[in-house]
């Protein structure tokens, strides 16, 4: 099994990456291959590259920072293009969304991202709480013990 994780932040190794890395580490521990793909650049060639990887993946996790109580504009544009190009390759694959915020807006962000999954008949994988981490820097996210535990729970549930 292989899981493709899309980092919807324009910051390659920021807070969203930190959260996705925790999920990937847990998936790897369960014997599942992972790849974190930098989706913070919605350039069409970048989306095409992700579409090729999605075709080979068995599951998808989409992570985004929270901007104005919503996913980043970059990941929205990226997902709009990806669904147009590769929607057929999304059908029935397990999926999950991850939100990273300094404070608030995470549940609204998760709701927007999960609409892409619902439309493509993707079973949504959850954790023992909302899939979110809190912090303004990767170091702060690394101190969010509850958030990181949620990421590990998500990884274990995706592996199941």
State what each model feature region is:
Residues 1-87, 138-160:
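N-terminal beta1-alpha1-beta2 submodule of the flavodoxin-like/Rossmannoid cofactor-binding fold
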Residues 91-134, 145-150:
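Short, glycine-/small-residue-rich phosphate/pyrophosphate-handling segment
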